[in-house]
Amino acid sequence: HEKFLTFDEAKDQPGYTIKYREDPIFLDPRNKNLGARLIINLEKLYLSLKKLDLHDANLKEYYSLSHSLGIVPKDLNKLKDKLFGIECNFEELNGIDFKKGCYVGQENTARIKLKNKLSKRLFPINVINGKLHEGESIYNNEVEIGKVLIDSDYPFALIKYLNENFDEKANFKTKEASINV
C-alpha cells in the first residue's frame, strides 16, 4: 500500500488503478491494507517487480492479513448458499453498490439495509484452544450467538452481533473449543 502511493498519479483509495507501461497496478478494491496488485504477463512479471522495487506476497502472511481484516482467504465455497452478501461484509469490502445495477439477491439485500435488519455478520474467529467443527454452535454463557461456517486454518463464523449476549472482547465456547472474535 505504501509503495503504491509512491508511484506518480497514485491515490489512496481502494481499487484505484494506475498503469505501468501497458499493465495495470491497483490497490485491492476490498481493502487497501491488502496492498496493490499487478496484472501482467508472467514472462514480464519478475523483471517488472525488480524495476518497480516490488516483491510478491508471502501467501501465508497474505492469508493471515486477509483473515484479520475479515476477508475470507480460503474455503469460500463453504459459504455458498448460506449467507447474503451483506452478511459477508460485501458492503464494507466495496462489493455492493446501492446506487447502481441489478444483481442476484438485490431485493433481499436492499430490504435488509433499508429496514436496518442486519443482525448477524461473518466474523473471523481465533481458536484459543481446542478444535472447531464446521456447523457447530458458538455460545456465550449458554446462549447461542453464532455458528462456525469455516473451520480451517482461517476460521469464520456467522455471529449474531446485535445479540445482547455478544461482547466482542469476550471469549466464547463451542463444543470442543474456546474462541474469540
Where in the sequence are the language-model features?
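Acidic, low-complexity central loop/insert segments
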Residues: 1-69, 139-140
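Hydrophobic transmembrane alpha-helix bundles
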Residues: 11-13, 18-24, 94-106, 152
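The conserved catalytic core of RNA pseudouridine synthases
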Residues: 22-40, 81-101
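Conserved active-site beta-strand-loop modules that form the wall/rim of enzyme catalytic pockets
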Residues: 36, 64, 75, 81, ...
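Short, charged, solvent-exposed linker or helix-capping segments at domain edges/interfaces
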Residues: 48-51, 78-79, 136, 168-170
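Short, conserved active-site entrance elements at the starts or edges of catalytic domains
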Residues: 58-60, 65-90
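Glycine-rich, small/acidic residue-mixed loop/short-helix segments
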Residues: 86-96, 106, 110-181
